[in-house]
């Protein structure tokens, strides 16, 4: 990784985050969806994005698979590459929050250290860790991409939940039961956003 160049300095923008938030009528923040593959992260995040759009809230969904088609296309699934994947997404999310958006990110992000890294990037009150807690057996039964089947057959190595560890969040900002209806989980998230004064009541 390249070292920071002392000749590269931060350039302050004339329009502040607060001014953008005032214009849009809501605060910028990241909801970081974490959980096993097949837990429902992308499904719940997508439902929340639709709900926010209907409420007139400017939002954007960063999906774990989608970013690997572009921003992170050069990365694999080693521990170092996973960390860099999360770092890049965290930096993009931080820029989006500065633009006043509500950012939804759906990533397995199996390690607590990487999730904490992004929390530290965002600062107090801007990072909401959403743990989509779905039992491994349920995730494996769903297996929407056929990845568990490949992992069990030894065709896919370093797969989270099978031969790579998933570190359960110890202090998630919201703990969702991934076996509940998506509509119910979406309501829970909207209630949280209102309670934290990110969107209007």
From Swiss-Prot:
Its transmembrane ranges are: none
Catalytic activity, as annotated: adenosine 5'-phosphosulfate + ATP = 3'-phosphoadenylyl sulfate + ADP + H(+)
Asked whether the keyword Transferase is assigned, the reply is yes
Give the EC number(s) listed in the UniProt record: 2.7.1.25
Gene Ontology MF terms in the entry: adenylylsulfate kinase activity; ATP binding
Q: What class of enzyme is it?
A: transferase
Q: Which InterPro entries match?
A: APS_kinase, P-loop_NTPase
Record keywords: ATP-binding included? yes
The record lists ATP as bound by: 35-42
The active site lies at 109
Q: In which pathway does it act?
A: Sulfur metabolism; hydrogen sulfide biosynthesis; sulfite from sulfate: step 2/3
Which BP terms in the Gene Ontology apply to this protein? hydrogen sulfide biosynthetic process; sulfate assimilation
Keywords of this entry? ATP-binding, Kinase, Nucleotide-binding, Phosphoprotein, Transferase
Q: Which PANTHER family match?
A: ADENYLYL-SULFATE KINASE 1, CHLOROPLASTIC (PTHR11055:SF63), BIFUNCTIONAL 3'-PHOSPHOADENOSINE 5'-PHOSPHOSULFATE SYNTHASE (PTHR11055)
Which purpose does this protein serve, as stated in its record? Catalyzes the synthesis of activated sulfate.
The cross-references to HAMAP family, in alphabetical order and at most eight, read: Adenylyl_sulf_kinase
- Give the family from UniProt: Belongs to the APS kinase family.
Q: What is this protein called?
A: Adenylyl-sulfate kinase
Q: Which organism is it from?
A: Erwinia tasmaniensis (strain DSM 17950 / CFBP 7177 / CIP 109463 / NCPPB 4357 / Et1/99)
Q: What taxonomic classification does the UniProt entry list for its organism? A: Bacteria, Pseudomonadati, Pseudomonadota, Gammaproteobacteria, Enterobacterales
């Amino acid at each position: 990784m390249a070292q920071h160049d002392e000749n590269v300095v931060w350039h302050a923008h004339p329009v502040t985050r607060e001014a953008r938030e005032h214009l849009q009528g809501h605060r910028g923040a990241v909801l970081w969806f974490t959980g096993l593959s097949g837990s429902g992260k992308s499904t719940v995040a997508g439902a929340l994005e639709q709900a926010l759009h209907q409420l007139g809230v400017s939002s954007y969904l960063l999906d774990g698979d989608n970013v690997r088609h572009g921003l992170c296309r050069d990365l694999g699934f080693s521990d170092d590459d996973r960390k860099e994947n999360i770092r890049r997404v965290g930096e993009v999310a931080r820029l989006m929050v500065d633009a006043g958006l509500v950012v939804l990110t759906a990533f397995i992000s199996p390690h607590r250290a990487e999730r904490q890294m992004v929390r530290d990037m965002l600062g107090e009150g801007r990072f909401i860790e959403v743990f989509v807690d779905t039992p491994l057996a349920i995730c494996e039964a769903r297996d929407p991409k056929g990845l568990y089947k490949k992992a069990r057959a030894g065709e896919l190595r370093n797969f989270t939940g099978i031969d790579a560890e998933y570190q359960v969040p110890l202090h998630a900002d919201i703990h969702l039961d991934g076996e509940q209806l998506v509509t119910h989980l979406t309501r829970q998230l909207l209630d949280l956003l209102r309670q934290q004064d990110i969107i209007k009541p």
